[in-house]
Regions:
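Short beta-strand/loop motif that positions the catalytic acidic residue
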Residues: 232-233, 239-241, 245
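Catalytic nucleophile-loop/oxyanion-hole region of alpha/beta-hydrolase
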Residues: 79, 105-136, 141
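Active-site glycine-rich loops that stabilize anionic/oxyanionic intermediates
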Residues: 67, 74-78
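Catalytic histidine-centered segment of alpha/beta-hydrolase-like enzymes
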Residues: 270-284
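Conserved alpha/beta-hydrolase "acid-adjacent" motif
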Residues: 246-252
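An N-terminal hydrophobic leader/cap segment in hydrolases
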Residues: 1-51, 57-60
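Conserved alpha/beta-hydrolase
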Residues: 87-110
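Hydrolase active-site cap/lid region
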Residues: 160-218, 267
């Protein structure tokens, strides 16, 4: 009886700690942008706000062509400045680029919601894309979304919803076939919370499993999106993964991309979010080839 009571008490403690830790994981400590477009020599840019369902998203707009638009996301716990390198490349190709902080990140609004969080992040992508097209582009502009790590999940979900008129999608270091894969990957890579009393490998592993489970519950998403849903069947998609990515293993990304006929998968010799750094030439060669193909098709269809 005492053993059973102790086991139940241990399980209850793990569930309690996991609830707090999962909430904190999806509402991370903020990191304000640490670099700005002007640090890269861009003069024609400004700060803008995107109105969303519960507040405002803070962003930077890099002015370019009105018929070439790009929305750029970031990883969990980071801010828009983490994706400046990719944004600068797109801007040099002539794109008008919007980098923005997801809710609960950077300088965007705080959303204290504890459930339905995946839907809210997807709404961020949709609202930012719609604002970019309506206020800073032409009606028939090519609109590209580039997501990295965590933001690849809501970016793909936004294409599946089909309301944001996304013409092409690039995903760097994600997403995987399961929502739980992202969180377990973080923990496997050593980014799990250090909780007093959970120092043994066994207790820590049990806690991390519980945190991942509770985080998935809080996201509240049906994943992965069905191949025929929304615009998935018509939208060209490029997925870039790293062969040594221990947060989002390439096998997990491949299991997802195998579901979609319009998906192209490129595997580089690098880790998580390291492709544009460690394999820079090939990373941007693959990206440029994809963009050229997308732009050509868009033009042939009668768009600008």
């Amino acid at each position: 009886m005492q053993i059973n009571d102790a086991s139940r008490g241990e399980a209850a403690m793990i569930r309690l700690v996991a609830r707090f830790a999962a909430f904190a994981l999806l509402h991370p400590r903020r990191r304000p942008p640490h670099r700005r477009p002007s640090d890269h020599g861009v003069a024609d840019w400004r700060s803008i706000s995107v109105v969303t369902d519960r507040g405002r998203l803070d962003g930077w707009l890099l002015h370019g062509r009105r018929d070439r638009l790009a929305l750029v996301g970031h990883g969990i716990g980071l801010s828009r400045s983490a994706s400046l390198d990719q944004a600068m490349h797109l801007h040099r190709r002539g794109y008008t680029v919007l980098l923005f902080d997801l809710r609960n990140h950077g300088r965007s609004h705080r959303d204290p919601s504890g459930t339905g969080i995946a839907d809210r992040f997807t709404t961020d992508i949709e609202q930012a894309a719609q604002t970019l097209r309506a206020d800073h582009g032409s009606t028939d502009a090519l609109l590209l979304v580039l997501g990295t790590s965590f933001s690849t999940f809501p970016s793909l979900a936004a294409v599946a919803r089909g309301s944001a008129r996304i013409d092409a999608l690039v995903c760097d270091s994600g997403p995987g076939l399961t929502l739980d894969s992202l969180f377990t990957g973080f923990f496997r890579a050593g980014f799990g919370p250090r909780v007093p009393g959970f120092r043994s490998p066994e207790r820590r592993a049990a806690l991390y499993r519980a945190i991942a489970s509770d985080a998935v519950r809080r996201l509240g998403s049906s994943w992965p999106p069905e191949p025929a849903k929304g615009d998935l069947a018509r939208t060209p998609m490029l997925f870039i993964t790293g062969s040594t990515d221990d947060i989002m293993p390439p096998s997990e990304v491949r299991r997802l991309t195998d579901r979609y006929d319009t998906a192209q998968l490129v595997t580089l010799d690098c880790g998580h979010l390291r492709g544009n750094k460690d394999q820079r030439e090939r990373y941007y060669t693959e990206l440029d080839a994809f963009l050229t193909a997308v732009e050509t098709v868009h033009t042939d269809r009668g768009a600008p």
